[in-house]
């Protein structure tokens, strides 16, 4: 997986009303993904983690979700 800089991540998130979503799921899991558009019209690939992870692991999972969304945009224009 391509690793992006924090600056690239920030610029990506500031464009097109993007936001990171953490969705709590049954079975002690969370899906973390990037939504795009004012109404969340486009959803990026999800990173699934355990619900009981610490704040540092959660931050890293959010970075991975942003990186996956960045890769998806790079591939599809």
PLM feature segments, named:
Residues 15-72:
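Short interaction-hotspot residues at assembly and binding interfaces
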Residues 2-20:
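Long, leucine- and charge-enriched amphipathic alpha-helices
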């Amino acid at each position: 997986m391509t690793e992006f800089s924090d600056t690239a991540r920030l610029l990506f998130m500031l464009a097109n009303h993007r936001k990171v979503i953490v969705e709590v799921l049954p079975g002690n899991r969370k899906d973390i993904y990037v939504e795009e558009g004012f109404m969340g019209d486009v959803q990026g690939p999800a990173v699934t983690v355990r619900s009981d992870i610490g704040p540092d692991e959660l931050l890293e999972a959010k970075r991975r979700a942003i990186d996956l969304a960045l890769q998806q945009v790079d591939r599809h224009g």
